[in-house]
């Protein structure tokens, strides 16, 4: 759902409530900031077939790479936005790129519902829109 401006978790929640199959939502940190209320709703509904994973590159990548203000002052430490993501538990936090493959495997092996977080470098390249 590139360009959905924060709607990916809500769409994933709707899908997960209408199927027994696993639903994987891969969200961006900028997108998450656009609809923080979705994390509260996901936590409260806690669908047993939903994975919500946040890719944190510190910017709104798909619309030009503008920095995400919540991350500017605290990266590489634990950020305020990660604390929000932890509200949808259990979550994993990865800030080292070399850990990402292992973290993804661990994440997918979790008991559902699950949430996760991965820090990535920004590319700020044109997204074709």
Residue ranges and their predicted role:
Residues 1-128:
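Thiamine diphosphate
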């Amino acid at each position: 759902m590139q360009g959905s401006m924060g709607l990916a978790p809500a769409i994933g929640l709707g899908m997960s409530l209408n199927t027994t199959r696993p639903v994987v939502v891969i969200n961006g940190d900028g997108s998450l900031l656009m609809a923080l209320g979705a994390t509260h709703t996901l936590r409260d509904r806690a669908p047993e077939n939903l994975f919500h994973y946040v890719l944190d590159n510190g910017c709104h990548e798909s619309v030009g790479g503008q920095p995400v203000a919540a991350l500017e002052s605290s990266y590489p430490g634990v950020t305020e936005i990660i604390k929000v993501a932890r509200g949808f538990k259990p979550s994993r936090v990865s800030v080292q790129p070399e850990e990402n493959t292992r973290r993804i495997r661990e994440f997918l092996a979790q008991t559902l519902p699950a949430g996760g977080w991965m820090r990535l470098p920004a590319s700020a390249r044109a997204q074709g829109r």
